[in-house]
Swiss-Prot record:
It catalyses: Exonucleolytic cleavage in the 3'- to 5'-direction to yield nucleoside 5'-phosphates. Its EC number is 3.1.13.1. Residues 189-516 form the RNB domain. It is found in: Cytoplasm. This is Exoribonuclease 2. Keywords: Cytoplasm, Exonuclease, Hydrolase, Nuclease, RNA-binding. It is an enzyme of class 3 (hydrolase). GO terms for biological process: mRNA catabolic process. Its main location: cytoplasm. It comes from Salmonella typhi.
Length: 644
């Protein structure tokens, strides 16, 4: 009798519409309960039984109940699941499989089975890729997943690499394919094989894409020729190899090995500017005045070169610092090093006054054994030879940016617009509290940005610099010429790494059109999105593998008194993050390790400080001594505490 009663239906509808609801993201805790975070200020408690219906990170709508003045959330509708495709470790019990997602806040095993077409016989400990198929908020009884790909077995020494690449859906190996002969591009190549071109790289580098040659002109000015490997001489636009490179967008450099953008036959051999091998190249010739200014008369041309020496960064740096047993093999090579050094100093000086120079940070190199074990982590400071190459590449990229802008009006540009205009007033207010007065309008111009950066670089510590970083916009890849505030340059277009960057291959094709005086179409916008997304994934993969290797390396230091110097890089409500100076590892110091009485402790992300009883005890950029309290291998996290 009540079944089709319209009054009852109306009443139900009314009750439903009057019941308070909230949309937010589920945050799990290790205690079984959770919270529905609606925004930075508001969250609702989710009791343990209700947490069984959801997963950490799910975006949901929940009904809000109030009982004895206490509010709680009952999950009702799934807006967006946190897990769709994921990696995890397989568990097997009584012929039933389940998978535990590889995520610090997801501890529960999800029942699963091998998807159709997956041949592997899964067993305990295997790593796999899975896809969620069922969710309790979608009317299913429980969570359920399909295993769509076998990654590797539990004891594989190379788990960090294979699991990380699978997580980010990145390629594991070099692309297939060969290039049999050079294309006829209708380009006249200047024969520069007699000139003393040299490459300067790490000892282990095989994919050498830049060679340098310098000479002094009669009037004392220096002429620099930058010759760059020429993969577009082998790879036709739209070909299978070109499309594979377009998808990869970059060579993926991970600790221990790389996954190239091009087949190794090209990247490490046919295109690589190997010593004493004749190679096609795209070249740029520029004239540099004594004060480092680049003359407007910039020439781009196709060439054939033969590198006369594969030089190594440390050898060249030691030799220039008069601290070397190594010697250049002849006077011609020695003269090249001296001239390139002069160019480096004058260009560095010019950039110091007219653009911006980055502070040198060391690169950290993992020394790995045969089985992927970490033998050592070496901090490699950026020395004078690194700077010679860096200054030459920046000069060459600046030349390409100008030529592409003036001749075509487009290219693949690296664009950075400095501060987000919406943040300009807040930025000026923050700087004022630290005694720096800037005009909110002026700081949005390239000149104003450079002026502020120079003032910040002159500060006794990097504390203020770290505070304003959050106001900066991100660098972007654009087909439209635009300034690069981070470098302090009016425009910047890279073409010096075409073996490892697809955007540089595009710029090569554009520069060749300029050389031939031909019209060419503007690159499609979607390619810049693909490159930005791939760059993001490659960086995450490098970080993830690094975290795993750092955890392995520091595992035996946990609970010992071994002290490490560490720079504070971030403060949050829960504690602070530090970077170990000697090896680059990131560790977390929980608030209770900073001070036992919670009420006397204030950790402020806003100010980048930790106060105890009202006194600032720690701040971002401080370097302190720490010991390793714990290494959690399952989450690859390192917990440190201030050294006593």
């Amino acid at each position: 009798m009540f079944q089709d009663n319209p009054l009852l239906a109306q009443l139900k509808q009314q009750l439903h519409s009057q019941t308070p609801r909230a949309e937010g993201v589920v945050k799990a805790t290790e205690k079984g309960f959770g919270f529905l975070e609606v925004d930075a200020q508001k969250s609702y408690f989710i009791p343990p039984p209700q947490m069984k219906k959801v997963m950490h990170g799910d975006r949901i709508v929940a009904v809000i109940h109030t009982e004895k003045e206490r509010e709680s959330a009952e999950p009702e509708e799934l807006i967006e699941p946190f897990l769709t495709r994921f990696v995890g470790k397989v568990q097997g019990k009584n012929d039933r499989l389940s998978i535990v997602p590889d995520h610090p806040l997801l501890k529960d095993a999800i029942p699963c089975r091998a998807a159709r077409g997956v041949q592997h016989e899964f067993k305990e400990g295997d790593w796999a890729v899975a896809e969620m198929r069922r969710h309790p908020l979608k009317g299913d009884r429980s969570f359920y997943a399909d295993l769509t790909q076998y990654i590797t077995f539990a004891d594989d020494h190379f788990v960090p690499w294979w699991v990380t690449l699978a997580r980010h859906n990145l390629e594991k190996e070099a692309p297939n394919g060969v290039a049999t002969e050079m294309l006829d591009e209708g380009l006249e190549r200047q024969d520069l094989t007699a000139l003393n071109f040299v490459t300067i790289d790490s000892a282990s580098t095989e994919d050498m894409d830049d060679a340098l040659y310098a000479e002094e002109l009669a009037d004392g000015r220096l002429q620099l020729t930058v010759a760059i490997a020429d993969p577009t001489a082998w790879i036709a636009e739209g070909s299978k190899l070109d499309n594979a490179a377009k998808i990869r967008a970059f060579t993926n450099y991970l600790p221990g090995f790389n996954i190239p953008m091009l087949p190794r036959e090209l990247s490490d051999d046919l295109c690589s500017l190997r010593a004493n091998e004749v190679r096609p190249a795209l070249a740029c010739r520029m004239i540099i005045a004594a004060d480092g200014t680049i003359d407007d008369d910039i020439a781009f041309f196709a060439a054939t070169i033969e590198s006369k020496a594969k030089l190594v960064y440390d050898n060249v740096s030691d030799w220039l610092e008069n601290n070397s047993t190594w010697q250049p093999e002849n006077e011609g090579i020695a003269q090249q090093i001296r001239l390139l050094h002069r160019i480096c100093l004058s260009r560095s000086e010019w950039r110091h006054h007219h653009a911006l120079v980055f502070k040198d940070r060391p690169d950290y190199r993992f020394v790995l054994g045969e089985k992927g074990e970490v033998l050592d982590i070496v901090a490699e400071p950026r020395r004078i030879a690194n700077r010679i190459v860096e200054e030459s590449m920046i000069a060459a990229n600046l030349c390409a940016a100008r030529v592409l802008r003036d001749k075509l009006g487009f290219g693949i540009y690296n664009v950075h617009t400095g501060f987000d205009p919406a943040n300009a007033d807040a930025l000026a207010a923050l700087l004022k509290t630290h005694g720096l007065h800037v005009d909110a309008e002026e700081v949005l111009t390239l000149e104003g940005f450079c002026k502020l950066r120079r003032e910040l670089d002159a500060q006794p510590s990097g504390f203020l610099d770290s505070r304003i970083r959050r106001f900066q916009s991100f660098a972007e890849i654009s087909t439209e010429p635009g300034p690069h505030f981070g470098l302090g340059l009016e425009a910047y277009a890279t073409w010096t790494s075409p073996i490892r960057k697809y955007g540089d291959m595009i710029n090569h094709r554009l520069l060749k059109a300029v050389i031939k005086g031909e019209a060419i179409a503007r690159p499609q916008e979607d390619i810049t999105q693909q490159m930005a997304e791939r760059r993001r994934l490659n960086r995450m993969a490098e970080r993830d593998v690094g975290d795993w290797l750092y955890a392995r390396f520091l595992n035996d230091k946990a609970g010992t008194n071994t002290r490490f110097a560490a720079e504070i890089i971030d403060v949050s409500r829960g504690g602070m993050r530090v970077r170990l100076v000697d090896n680059g590892a990131i560790a977390f110091i929980p608030a209770p390790f900073l001070h036992a009485v919670r009420d006397e402790l204030v950790c402020s992300q806003e100010n980048g400080t930790v106060q105890i009883k009202g006194e600032t005890v720690y701040k971002v950029t401080d370097v302190i001594d720490v010991t390793i309290a714990e290494v959690r291998m399952e989450t690859r996290s390192i917990i440190a505490r201030p050294a006593a």
